[in-house]
Amino acid sequence: IRHILVRHEQAAAMAADGYARATGKVGVCIATSGPGATNLVTGIMGAKADSVPLVAITGQVARAALGTEAFQECDICSIAASCTKKTFMVMSAEDLAPTIREAFQTAQEGRPGPVLVDVPRDVQLEVVEAMFPEANAIPVPEVPSGTRDKLQAAARLINEAERPVII
């Protein structure tokens, strides 16, 4: 896994979005709990609006502190519910691998879009044996590309247009 350090969580979400658009693969970003997680929301919303497959992984306070207004606790799953296809809170380390697998599948299947996985601090520290899928076990949809004839036809239409607009 190649990690790219950014200076702000919003930039992380935007970079993951750009990676997904450029490669056709799922973009991934991570953030700490509380304000770090909420800073991802603008980028996540952009990914939802444009059907970009993205998995955002956020930290969370320990399970025992949930609901106590602990330092940097926020209900990021509720906050992100309207701008993701699905949110997950991983309550056991045994559930982490299958949840990540489901998050990637959800991000890609049907209309692509963002998914958020929230992981409490104590779950992050648990040690378990996990089986992760092989690299090709999660099917990656083929990115459609135009044929040479269709691309030439599109170029001709643009060149012949009096007032072309490219979006």
Residue positions per predicted region:
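N-terminal alpha/beta PP-like core and its mobile active-site loop of ThDP/TPP-dependent enzymes
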Residues: 1-167
